Amino acid sequence: MSRINLVTTEQANEQQLVLFSAIEQQIGIVPNFLKVFANSPAALQAFLGLHSIASEGDLDTKTKERIALGLAEQNACQYCVSAHTALGKGAGLSGEEILANRAGSSQD
């Protein structure tokens, strides 16, 4: 089976390093899925632009994570569920709330 590899910091070219630096400044790390996107800097830049647009608006972080948890579960994306569980906990969601969000409901 073909596999798309991660772009590591050691392998990254100048353009990729600039993008990695911007990601690290925003969220503290470069998640593996973004290291895969870095195989195409244009795709990574487009994703970051979309993420920036989605981050704007009036919804608070908890609400955004509640929505992301429900979508991740519906998409059957275990990577996304794991990531948004951690982000949800960081935003102050309880374990019970996270389970409710994954089931498409909320205690709030």
Model-predicted regions and their roles:
Residues 1-108:
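Hydrophobic alpha-helical segments
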